[in-house]
Amino acid sequence: MEKDHLVEEEKKDKVESEKPEEGVTVPKVESNDDIHQTDTPKVDSTTSEGKLKDPVAVERPSINSTNTSSSGGFGNTVNDLSQPSTRPVTTAETSTNSNLPWDGNQANRNLNSQSYDLRVHLLKSLGIEDISRIDIADNKLLERFFSLHIEREQKEIEKLKTKNLEKLELIVDKFVSNEKFTNDTLNKLLELISSKSIDSHDLLGSSSIQLKRTEHSPNRLMSPRGHKRYKSEIPTVPETQYSHINYNIHGQPVNMVYHQAYQQVTPQTYYVPQGNQAWHQGSYTQGNRATFQPPSLANSNINNSEDVKLQEGVKVEPSGRARQRSSTSLGASLSTSNSTSNLSNTMKAATANEGKDTGSNDGHHTGSYGASNASNVMPSQVNNPNYMTYGSVRGGPYVMVQQPPGQQMATQYIPAGNQGFYQSVVPNQGHMNGMVASSQGYQANTPQPATSDNMVMLGNQYRGNETLHQDATPSLSSSTSQKRQGHRRTQSANVVLSTGRSPNRMNMQRQVNFLIHTPKHPPPT
């Protein structure tokens, strides 16, 4: 029963809503068929003044109805939806709707702003300015536009090619018609064109100058001492040059005969010819000694000045029986070295004629010893088969004789003049502390064959069977111990070479620099 009652009330409400109210004009709504048949829609709505509001106004159905039911409430919602209402649409609304890319296309509204702007920019670059009538969301449409644009560019390129060919033909015709144009000029033009093309290809090529690249190992970069030198980077001394080099207690190379701390003098070597050989037939290592004329034995001149320079390397090579006689006599005279009578008499005889004939000493200035002076010190040594090294160090000359392995002899110092036999052979006792060979400091041991290993060194180190007295030369152990006293981490370690080995057999050793880390001075972290 209640349902029937509700249905009757709804029917009554429908009838009342269909009746027109007084003062309200109901607009006539045309069907869709009428709208398609006529181009311009009919406008029935007027304003309260009786004039047309907008001549272009179009009535459209509105979903929300302004009419309310008499009963109030929401019972009239169905009638509101069923009855379409019209409202005028102005030109302002149509202009705002026309700003959209394609009015009525939902796909354009779903595009992102960035893609939309990009597509608009591309279309404008192709020459399309009015984009309002184009569906930008359609990808196929964009591809068509781009294909058309590419075709246009290709046509323009072909036009340029044809124009260039026409100009080239005209230029070639002019050159051919000219009499001055020959094959040589044509070849030159072709060479220029080919060279330009090659240069253009080689612009990015590698340069002819190869730069040296410094290779840094990761160990060097990670080390706290980045300036550390490796073994391969340190220059080595050849084996042939090492025989002339000696090392002191500090590990520094010094001259074997002359100490580095006082003065270094370049040694000079002379060649003494054989007994039967003329002096001009001998070979000389120094060019300025080519005119050297040795004085005779009677005209020997031994200078005792303090400015005498060092000379060494006299080589005597006699032959025959004189070799045996001289070797035996020289060995006998030198073996009795402890008694100075024989040598002193020899020196007196040699120096008796001092200053008699100075003009025969050609090629030498006053105060220097020549090869003849060394040979005149001991007359028996002129035809000696041995190697005789001589020189003088501010006190007088010395002679170092080396015997072949078959014979035995001793090596002696031979001073000049009236000086003592073993008196002050080393220069300047103040500079050479403890490096003086006194008369009590020389001891002749058992003779031994003098070879290249048994060599005389003045004051610094003595290599051979003959040894100096302990009072004359201080031991290396005491000197090194004094140097190592108060050793701190800032000082480098000293490498002392062995004194019992010859320099030829000695291995190459370098100064070793390292830090000693203690708990008080730990290594860097």
From Swiss-Prot:
Residues 1-108, 285-376, 467-506 are annotated as: Disordered. It comes from the Eukaryota. It is found in: Nucleus. Residues 1-22, 30-42, 306-320, 354-365 have a biased composition (Basic and acidic residues). One of its GO terms (cellular component) is nucleus. Residues 62-71, 326-346 have a biased composition (Low complexity). The keyword Chaperone does not apply. Its main location: nucleus. The keyword Transcription regulation applies. Keywords: Activator, Cell cycle, Cell division, Mitosis, Nucleus, Stress response, Transcription, Transcription regulation. Disulfide bonds: none annotated. Residues 78-108, 285-305, 470-483, 491-506 have a biased composition (Polar residues). GO terms for biological process: cell division. Belongs to the POG1 family. Transcriptional activator which promotes cell cycle recovery, after pheromone induced G1 arrest. May also be involved in stress-resistance. This is Transcriptional activator POG1. It comes from Candida glabrata (strain ATCC 2001 / BCRC 20586 / JCM 3761 / NBRC 0622 / NRRL Y-65 / CBS 138) (Yeast). The lineage of its organism: Eukaryota, Fungi, Dikarya, Ascomycota, Saccharomycotina.
